[in-house]
């Protein structure tokens, strides 16, 4: 499983293990899966959709940055 951390300036939005995450990148949406290669990307207005073992959730964002490293996806967002 991929570890996901979504952080806003005022709070931790989500932290947990997920199967996949789809992000609104500035050059198009992209999906991060378990054992993804390291990457840093800016995000634009849209939805972050993440799939857990028991279902799917989404978070609307205005902008942000995402980094994948060592099977951890850290996302800093403006909500």
What are these regions (language model features)?
Residues 2-79:
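Compact, glycine-rich, soluble single-domain proteins
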